[in-house]
Amino acid sequence: MEQLGFEGMPRRLYPCTPTRLATWLDCPRRYRMTYLDRPSPPKGPPWGHNSLGASVHNALAGWWRLPLAQRTTAAAGALVDRGWINEGFADETQSVRQRERAIAMVEAYVSLLDPADEPLGVERTVATRTDVIAVSGRIDRLDARPPEPDPAEPGPAEPGPAESGPAESHPAGYGSATAAATELVVVDYKTGRHLLSTDDARGSMALALYALAAGRVLRRPCHRVELHHLPSGQILAWSHTDESLARQLGRAEGIAAECATADEQYRGGLPADRYDEVFPPRLGPGCGWCDYRRHCPEGTAASTPRRPWDGL
C-alpha cells in the first residue's frame, strides 16, 4: 500500500558536518562512496601528509591537557615523538626525517605560547541547528580574547585589526585566552606545504560554521577565525561580521539541501545505472589524491597517480 505524506510537513533536519558538505562540493561520486555506499569501497594506502598532520594535531591537543607545570617546549616535542603515526612514508629514513620536522614545527609553535593561557576548548565539538540543518564539528582550539578594537573609536597609535574585514597575518604565538575575555576565537591548525592567505580564512565555510556554533553554544560573540600554519609560523586571520557568517550559513544550507535530495534518491533504491546522474564525478587536480581513485575510471584517466608521500 502506498504511504501517503502530509503536505506542508517540515522536512527533517539534515545532519551534517562541514567535511561532509565540502566532500559533496568537491566530488559527488566521492561523497557517495564515502557516506552512502555500504560497504564502502576499499580506500587506497594512507597518506604521509595526513599522518604528519594527525601527529601534530594530537600532540598540540595533548600539550594543552598536560598539567600547567609540564607544558614545556620539550614536552610538546616528546608528544609528537611518542604519538608519531608511521604510515604513508617511502621508508623509515623518510619517516624519521618527517618526524624530526614535525617535532621542530611543534616546538617552535608552542615556544611562543603562554602555557597559562588556557583555551576554552581543545578538540571541542560544537553543534547548532537551523530550520534546514543540524551541523556539528570539532574545533582544534577555541580561545577567548578581549574584543578587537572598534576602528571607529579613538585608540592607541597602533590599533589592532578591525572587527570586520581583512585581518593581518601574525607570527605564531599571537595571543590566546585571558580571564577577562568576552569574545571567542576559532583556531584551526594547518600543516600543509602550501602557503595560505587571509582569503583562506575568510572563505572557509567550516571555520564560519564553527564560529556560529561556538557562539550559540557558549552564548558569547564569535566572529574571528584563524588558520595557524605551523610550517611557516604564520597566523592567517579573518574577523567575520554577522552578515558574512549568515552568508556562509546560507551557503551551507543550500549544499545540505542538495545532499539531502541525493541521499533520499540513493536510499530510495536509486538504480546503479543512474548513480552518475545523481552523483557525477567532478574531475580536477584533486583526483590524483582521491582515496577512491582506483574505483573511478574517469578520475584515473584524468589524473596522475600520487605516491603516498608526495604531499609532504
Identify the function of each model-found stretch:
Residues M1-L312:
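RecB-family 4Fe-4S metal-dependent nuclease core
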